[in-house]
Each structure stands twice: as structure tokens, then as C-alpha cells.
């Protein structure tokens, strides 16, 4: 598991699309939490349980560990929770590229990951989930800008009618120890974090 963000990410399942739809599961973990023994959370345990299902019963799952501390440059993100927005966009891209009519969406998160999946649910509810053929990085950045600036405006409504699937429903949002993305309120860092995450 790996990605450009420096966090481990895992996907399981997601092969063929069965009649009656399939389950798409997003699991976002908390700060400093991983799948490693002694650092796993309820979010990580859910991922492991799904991973251990027989191959034919596994849903399509996206898991991403929380913000990690590997160098001093990571300290600001660990303290304030900044950097959560790209995580939400990656999870959105996973869903948008795989969703087909009839699929069921389940979102799970722990701590800041709980905040993230709630925001992801808000993004899908307010604007929508783009159809798979439109699930490009550029399109996801565009819908993110709409969500940040004017999710109820005319532009967002036109975007939703043009690019989004109107029948998307979220079956469940399961959160553990949900918090605001902003962590410790240090001068300067707190103000910047508020600007980056207040729109959620």
C-alpha cells in the first residue's frame, strides 16, 4: 500500500459488477493511526474484517491511514489537521470512478477520519457524485472548488445536472470519536487551519 501523500492506502475487492449492485466502502483513519498492531483503531479493524471475507463476498473498499509524522515538516499537519482536503478528494475519486447505479455506499471514519467522511457525505449530498467517465483529477478539483465556495449556487446546480449521477444514495455514515479537522489551537497555525477547513 502506498501513495504520493506518504500515507498507506489499501483497496480490496471491486472486480466485476454484480446484478443488484455492490457495496463501495470508504474507511478513513485518524491521525497517527495505521493498520499496524498497537496503532489500529475501529476504522482499521473494519478494514481488516472486510479484507478477511472470502473473495466473492468482499465489497470494494478504500482505506487510508491518518496523517502521519515522519519528518518535522509533517508536524503542522499532525497538529492542525490541514491536509485533510486532499484525503477527501482521493476518497471521492475512488467512489466516482467505481459507482454504478444500484451500488451501495458506506462511509466509516475515526477521529479526523470521521470528520473527513462526514465532509465527503456533505459533498455528495450538496453537489453529487460525478459519473465514472468524468472522474478525472481535474473534474474532482472543480467540484471541490464549488463545494468550498458556493455549493448551493446556480453554477453548482448546472454542474450537478450535467456531470453527476442523480440516483446516488449513501447507505451509512459510521463515525468513531469524531472531531473537527482543526487540532491544537496554536497561534498562526490555528488561523490557517480554520481558513482551510471552515467551509466543511
Protein language model features and the residues they cover:
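Alpha-helical segment proximal to the catalytic Tyr-Lys
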Residues: 2-200
Amino acid at each position: 500500500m502506498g501513495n504520493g501523500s506518504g500515507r498507506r492506502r489499501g483497496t480490496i475487492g471491486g472486480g466485476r459488477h454484480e446484478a443488484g449492485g455492490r457495496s463501495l466502502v470508504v474507511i478513513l483513519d485518524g491521525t497517527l493511526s495505521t493498520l499496524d498492531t498497537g496503532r489500529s483503531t475501529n476504522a482499521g479493524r473494519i478494514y481488516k474484517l472486510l479484507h478477511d471475507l472470502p473473495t466473492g463476498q468482499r465489497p470494494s473498499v478504500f482505506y487510508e491511514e491518518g496523517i502521519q509524522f515522519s519528518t518535522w515538516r509533517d508536524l503542522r499537519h499532525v497538529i492542525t489537521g490541514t491536509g485533510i482536503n486532499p484525503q477527501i478528494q482521493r476518497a471521492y475519486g475512488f467512489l466516482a470512478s467505481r459507482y454504478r447505479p444500484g451500488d451501495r455506499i458506506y462511509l466509516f471514519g475515526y477521529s479526523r477520519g470521521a470528520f473527513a467522511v462526514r465532509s465527503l457525505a456533505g459533498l455528495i449530498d450538496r453537489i453529487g457524485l460525478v459519473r465514472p467517465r468524468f472522474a478525472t483529477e481535474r473534474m474532482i478539483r472543480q467540484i471541490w472548488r464549488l463545494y468550498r465556495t458556493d455549493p448551493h449556487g446556480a453554477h453548482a446546480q448546472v454542474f450537478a445536472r450535467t456531470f453527476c449521477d442523480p440516483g446516488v444514495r449513501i447507505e451509512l455514515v459510521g463515525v468513531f470519536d469524531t472531531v473537527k479537522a482543526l487540532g491544537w489551537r496554536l497561534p498562526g497555525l490555528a488561523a490557517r487551519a480554520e481558513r482551510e477547513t471552515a467551509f466543511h
